UniProtKB/Swiss-Prot annotation:
It is found in: Cytoplasm. The keyword Transmembrane does not apply. It comes from Klebsiella pneumoniae (strain 342). This is Peptide chain release factor 1. One of its GO terms (molecular function) is translation release factor activity, codon specific. The gene is prfA. PANTHER family: LD18447P.
Length: 360
């Protein structure tokens, strides 16, 4: 491993020890804000510190085994130990390089998830409903909260469009690779001839921004309409104009929120989604301008980004970005998404490592 990387790891390890000592200090415990900030930092440094400690131990094991090679009686055992230690050292080195990759500050944030039915009419709306249920089940397994902000239901079930806020640990970091086009191939319930139809939906995942990072939005650029909320909601539906529709005139972005009975709360939530969308559009524009020969695994939420195909007759799900095919569609639709998310996260990290080594 390069000496510059070892020096960086040593500094991070020392900081980990320093933070650990501070967390046991009475003055730190008395200051709740400081204690919370240091606890977060400690959690972030723990993996690096643990992995680096293991790596240092392996380096010592390698030195010991090399010294034993001079002893004829110990040589065979030493060669075996040396081989095992070098293999373990290589694995730890790889892990450490991944842990040192620059962190996306958005990864730990909550996220807005939009699922829209695309081509395919009623069947696309039904599939949008299936996708939203899939993400909701995944959220449940990770103990995240899901709050629907706006839903435009399909005539025969599902959604023409649904927007929800997913809250919890590391939501955006796990879901950000879902942005893009999702295609389904199956026989619709309404199809009497048994023909397979292809429908599509688009998914957009955007981090929820803290107040300080919201883009500047000129109130004069907004058109705000109120209307009566529709859909599930019991006796309070259609009794007041509490639902809000905000149009950002310069970009044409439209956001609706009809979740709350209070117009005030709906407006605040809609503005939060609008800020996230405006920033996402700016990021997408910047990525396009910087588009190099390297592929971008992070989709823009545009239908032209073909992420996955869900083939029901074959029980198959294919991620086109990394050529991954799994015959585990039922589990996927039940929200067991880690088997699809993990490989793409690893591929993304490999791309980042390749980019860093090119810079060096």
């Amino acid at each position: 491993m390069k000496s510059s990387i070892v020096a960086k790891l040593e500094a991070l390890y020392e900081r980990h020890e320093e933070v650990q000592a501070l967390l046991g200090d009475a003055a730190t415990i008395a200051d709740q804000d400081k204690f919370r900030a240091l606890s977060r930092e400690y959690a972030q440094l723990s993996d690096v510190a643990r992995c680096y400690t293991d790596w240092r131990q392996v380096q010592e094991d390698i030195e010991t085994a090399q010294m034993m090679l001079d002893d004829p009686e110990m040589r065979e055992m030493a060669q075996e130990e040396l081989r095992d230690a070098k293999e373990k050292g290589d694995q730890l080195e790889q892990q450490l390089q991944v842990l040192l990759l620059p962190k996306d500050p958005d990864d730990e944030r909550n996220a807005f998830v939009e699922v829209r039915a695309g081509t395919g009419g009623d069947e696309a709306a039904l599939f949008a409903g299936d996708l939203f249920r899939m993400y909701s089940r995944y959220a449940e397994s990770r103990r995240w909260q899901v709050e629907i902000l706006s839903a435009n239901e399909g005539e025969h079930g599902g959604f023409k469009e649904v927007i929800a806020k997913f809250s919890g640990d590391g939501v955006y970091g796990r879901l950000k690779f879902e942005s893009g086009g999702h295609r389904v191939q199956r026989v619709p319930a309404t199809e009497s001839q048994g023909r397979i139809h292809t429908s599509a939906c688009t998914v957009a995942v955007m981090p929820e921004l803290p107040e300080a990072e919201m883009p500047d939005i000129n109130p004069a650029d907004l058109r705000i309409d109120t209307f009566r909320s529709s859909g599930a909601g019991g006796q309070h539906v259609n009794t007041t104009d509490s639902a809000i529709r905000i149009t950002h005139l310069p970009t044409g972005i439209v956001v609706e929120c009809q979740d709350e009975r209070s117009q005030h709360k709906n407006k605040a939530k809609a503005l939060s989604v609008l800020g996230a969308r405006i920033r996402a559009a700016e990021v997408a524009k910047r990525q396009q301008a910087e588009a190099s020969t390297r592929r971008n695994l992070l989709g823009s939420g545009d239908r032209s980004d073909r992420n996955r195909t869900y083939n029901f007759p074959q029980g198959r799900v294919t991620d086109h970005r990394i050529n991954l095919t799994l015959y585990r569609l039922d589990e996927t639709m039940e929200g067991k998404l880690d088997m699809l998310i993990e490989p793409i996260v690893q591929e993304y990290q490999a791309d980042q490592l390749a980019a860093l080594s090119e810079q060096e």
